[in-house]
Regions:
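Short glycine-enriched loop/turn motifs at secondary-structure junctions
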Residues: 4-5, 54-57, 126-129, 194-198
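Short loop/turn elements that form and flank the Walker-type P-loop nucleotide-binding site
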Residues: 5-7, 95-97, 219-220
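Short, structured helix-loop boundary elements
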Residues: 31, 67, 95, 207-210
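Catalytic beta-strand-to-alpha-helix segment of the class III nucleotidyl cyclase homology domain
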Residues: 39, 61-176
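Conserved phosphate-binding and hydrolysis motifs of nucleotide-dependent enzymes
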Residues: 57-58, 105, 206
Length: 221
């Protein structure tokens, strides 16, 4: 694979929601639907100067030299996926719902493949979302915020603990007028500070006073 970007890059991870169940229910329709899915993702990635580095059967891993190219890819793919559907033998409409996650950072490129924690975080960000949803990390949001077109915005989803990662991540949802905006709660654990009112932080910076008060209470017993 030639001309893969190095240094600071952006990864896009995608996954078809409930793909195992769909294969059980619609084995024939899924063959055609998956072919459309693969074509849509490939065209979206390549049209935005990206590279597909791995296919997973129900998703792709792609890399971009800029975060904006990655976000443009996700938006373009979601729009096309919403228009693509298969009709089953019982006249049910089958539309694939794809969750997407993006993260920006450094990764080691070796023998045509990437390694490092940046990929792990991108995968966990993707897994926190739902079909049709595009989530990005805080660093990706910082990089693209001033460069987004007027019809694209970022919705602050708060800070979340992601499975297997020590450091919590502030997540943002990419919002576009013609894409779904409302989704269930993320598949993650919000950090405790998300739910604490600000007045509960009044003792921050007053450790000495608290220690002395504790000593006085102890001596009075």
């Amino acid at each position: 694979m030639n001309n893969l970007p190095t240094g600071t890059v952006t990864f896009l991870f995608t996954d078809i929601e409930s793909s195992t169940k769909l294969w059980e229910q619609y084995p024939e329709e899924m063959k055609s639907a998956l072919a459309k899915h693969d074509s849509i993702l490939k065209n979206a990635v390549e049209s935005n100067h990206g590279h597909i580095i791995k296919t997973t059967g129900d998703g792709v891993h792609a890399v971009f030299s800029t975060a904006l190219d990655g976000i443009n890819t996700a938006i373009a793919a979601q729009r096309r996926l919403n228009q693509a559907s298969e009709v089953s033998e019982t006249s049910e409409v089958l539309t694939l719902r794809v969750r997407m996650g993006l993260h920006t950072g450094e990764a080691e490129l070796r023998d045509g493949d990437y390694y490092g924690s940046t990929l792990n975080r991108a995968a966990r960000i993707m897994s926190a979302g739902h079909g049709g949803q595009v989530l990005i990390s805080d660093i990706t949001a910082q990089v693209v915020r001033e460069h987004l077109p007027a019809d694209i915005s970022l919705l602050d989803m708060g800070e979340h603990h992601l499975k297997g990662l020590l450091r919590a991540e502030k997540l943002y949802q990419v919002v576009a007028a013609d894409l779904q905006k409302e989704f269930p709660a993320l598949n993650s654990i919000p950090t405790a500070t998300n739910n604490l009112p600000t007045q509960l932080t009044s003792f921050i910076g007053r450790e000495r006073e608290m220690t002395e008060a504790a000593k006085r209470l102890a001596s009075a017993r």
